[in-house]
Curated annotation (Swiss-Prot):
Self-association state and partner proteins as the record states: Heterodimer with the terminal protein; this heterodimer binds to bp 9 to 18 of the genome. Forms a complex with viral pTP, DBP and hosts NFIA and POU2F1/OCT1 for initiation of replication.
Protein name (record): DNA polymerase
Family: Belongs to the DNA polymerase type-B family.
EC number(s) from the headed UniProt entry: 2.7.7.7
Gene of this entry: POL
Gene source species: Human adenovirus F serotype 40 (HAdV-40)
A Pfam family this chain is assigned to: DNA_pol_B_2
Keyword Nucleotidyltransferase tagged: yes
Amino acid sequence: MALVPSPRAGGFLPAETHSGPQPPRRRVRQSTAGAAPTATRAPRRRAATASPGEPPSTTASGRPPAANNVSLTPNSRLRGTIVAPRGQGLLYAIDTATNSPMEIKFHRRLASALTRLLQVNLRSVPADLNEAFLDSLDSSQIRTLALKLKVPRVEVWTCGSRGVVVPSIIHPQQERAGAEEGDEGERQDTEDFLNFPLRFLVRGRQVHLIQEMQSVQRCEYCARFYKYQHECTVRRRDFYFHHINAHSSGWWQKINFFPIGSHPRVERLFVTYDVETYTWMGAFGKQLVPFMLVMHLSGEEALVKEACRLACELQWDTWGNDERTFYVVTPEKLAVGKKFREYRNRLQAHFALQLWRGFLAANPQLAEWACLEMGLFSPDYLTYEELQKAPKLQGRPRFLELYIVGHNINGFDEIVLAAQVINNRSDVPGPFKITRNFMPRAGKILFNDITFALPNPSSKKRTDYRLWEQGACDDSDFKYQFLKVMVRDTFALTHTSLRKAAQAYTLPVEKGCCPYKAVNEFYMLGSYRADERGFPAEDYWKDREEYLLNRELWEKKQCPHYDLVRETLDYCALDVLVTAALVQKLRESYAQFIRDAVGLPEASFNVFQRPTISSNSHAIFRQILYRTVKPQRSDLGGSLLAPSHEMYDYVRASIRGGRCYPTYIGVLREPLYVYDICGMYASALTHPMPWGFPLNPYERALAVRDWEHALLQVGTPIDYFNRTLLPGIFTIDADPPPENLLDVLPPLCSRKGGRLCWTNEPLRGEVVTSVDLITLHNRGWHVRLLPDERATVFPEWRCVAKEYVHLNITAKERADREKNQTLRSIAKLLSNALYGSFATKLDNKKIVFSDQMDSATIKSIAAGQINIKSTSFVETDTLSAEVMPTFQRAYSPEQLAVVHSDAEESDEEPGHAPFYTPTHKPNDHVTYTYKPITFMDAEEDDLCLHTLEKVDPLVENNRYPSQIASFVLAWTRAFVSEWSEILYAEDRGTPLEQRTLKSVYGDTDSLFVTEAGYRLMETRGKKRIKKHGGNLVFDPKHPELAWLVECETVCAQCGADAYSPESVFLAPKLYALKCLRCPSCQQISKGKLRAKGHAAETLNYDLMLKCYLADFQGEDARFHTSRMSLKRTLASAQPGARPFTVTETNLTRTLRPWKDITLAPLDAHRLVPYSQSRPNPRNQEVCWIEMP
């Protein structure tokens, strides 16, 4: 390092450090602005030191010492070569006028450079332009300087952002001439002007004189400026592309990471509840109103005791002898929600106050500081921002979590109660930072979490990440100590009914059920139909079997009379206890799974920390990846990135949905077998995925060239695991082979016609993965890569999810051996949920309450960056309220007189007050009738919901690597493509009309094959049938596609493959197999029926057959199915929908064959994909095609 004397007053500055290779050490030349071409050498000797009391030394001429004669004090420890500052500087920038790169050579000191320039041109410096003025000149004084120097023209080059210069021109002569013309009789100055222009460079507020400007070249890949040639490295090209380039620097973002485990000292309280409702006929239809709520308290013993005490204080009734189970029963419309809201608010306020008192006990100095510095008599009145300014805080942080839990409450109970309980305005001390995460999505409340936070004195930035690799964290990792109030739904973690979940996790379940139809009728009409002992009539139950079972169970209780409300309460309480047991079982089971199966014994895993099984699976995946990669930072590093902005939409365009369509409509009277791919998404996840920072444009072009060479080899298959071909996402055109080489399982689908179609038509401008390139090429398609700046190539393949899938499969196999149903359920759910987390679709919308809008959001709305798309209000009769009824009061004239009061001025028009109207009576009293007044138990901001949307359509994504989802689906298409080779390779060259029928229906992971297809599967496809052995997990040592199928239609008695002798297909997801017949034991079992959107329990094979025949024969018959549906409204701007309500609607759907088909008919029954001879009639897109 060299020490450079600063050109300004003040000593030494370290020389600029250059990251590139340094030249060999040599004696440094010294130059100044006015130096001769051959500069003198700087002396390599230490400057003489002066004693502390001596004045600064001078030269023999009496002038101060030169810049290189530097005086050092005895305490100076500076080492190195002393060099003078350079007189000139170089700047490379882009001219905004011509968009061309240029080199600007300028003088660093304006005074010396301008003086020397004027001396060379035999001009003297004006007296008022002294050295101090010139060196301190800023951009606003350039015009003044030009007028004083009387130059014909001044060019000003101003440095802008991101390496650009903006030129501007000043004409001082014209301005001077205009000023002199305005003064009559004044003679124009005849003094000579400078006969050449001046050019100035403005950097910040400094002005420099430009010595020379010339055009240069700029590398488009690394942005380096050069005159003739240059060398740029891969590292520099990558850095420029991902971090500097304004267009592409935001395309890929690093994924944030935090350990999967929670803090080991978190104290948790679980409030598990369930509600029962009845139907109330209102203005918006049949609205469901709660009349009963049962809750059970569990968790940390100390917290449970305090919660129970508070419930007793609020006069909740205990259920039976269980001191931790409480209930409320009342038919009053708003009473249940109001009481539950009061309890939740009091609970969170109590624990928040407890947390604050502990914080004050650890920081007793706060009271004195708040009084002296803030003028407050109590620290309770501090704000969070003021609390952060307090002197050094201390104390051990405390973490509290309050969970409101139920089964399927996010889609029903929380919506019904939301208008009464959705409130975060609690009586908590002022220093808390209160944040709220409320997210309604798809008819459910996905998040409704409130956090009360205080500063954490132990918080600091982590430098050693080994603890994170083990999934654990400590006090220093949390910025806040907090109380979190979270709503969690066990249905989101089990994806099944409460009874099935209890069976899956080996929990005891009481027999019997409740006649909710009778309960509903009782609360609607005041009575219900029953026998002499009050037992509900048989038609209130599902069937006679259920009626007899429940009657038998009730008679065992030996009760003289059936108490409907009491029985409903008991059933509701039992459901709550089962849910509470399920909560405990889920906590223990998942924690053990993380410790044993995942191998993270240090992690304090809490499955309820995240709301869904998908979010938990994604967290486990990231933790496993973090442990493997060891990035030593708070993100996953540069190996796995998330597409963002323009790249997010581009990658999402390559995510193509699953296959689901019949190729046969009507009745099929021949054997039919159903094959399913075993764990299709899990198997696909084990295959190689793109890894690392995407290549820069130069390296990308080289990789694209390799792909183009491979795709030009027509007839030569490409290996899916060819190491010379890098993974990527491309824009392509593709042309199919001749139609006699096509089949009914196309390799790719398209949305160009507005509907998702699996088509054999030419593809234009499709975004696909590199796996799809190989699939198309190997199926005989001619593929061309199109130039696209968003095309992405990754540097390598990596099996990123193989370990995650493998440990789940291992856990599932161990569960089967040990008959551990709980472990099997967990492994199966986690294995199936990961793909969905990768495919999560983000948008720029969010729904907030008015009181949620922080200052940043309000500023964005004011600046036009965020739009309020819609606003809805929670109706007043759905909120907690107190109503003052109509009343009258009579006043005598004396009472109405205003005594000893001053008159008040008012600009308002005289009129009646809004809450009463005067009555006209002949007596001498005045009677006022007050109308009912509703006092809302809510603030005005609590009533208003805003749907906010960013104006910028580009999505910010730093969470989900969506390219993984794209490649997972591409691998599944490769599976199906290989499956089609098994079935249809022998048909290539035969027209479609003359081919044997081998498959009639294709779903995402299944295929319905005929007898001919079954024989091919047992011969050519034998290696892909699970019962014959094979791999479900990709093996990098022996790279090949890993997927297996198994026959779903099996005999229930002997387990052999069975078939359906007769089937009917009406539409996608609308078909029926009459029965299953086993060729081995001749056993006939129940068939299979699928009717998405219909009430399947009301359908059967004969009815669907009748429906098809009626339509085929042209009969004027209508077939309908009807089912009760719950309409959930969260935040809606529709005039007929009320926010936070659940209403019953009767959904009626027409049952009929497929009308709006996305295939081309081949004959009366068979369908084939669209092709060039049978084009898609929906395609209206116009594209440019250059003919050869």
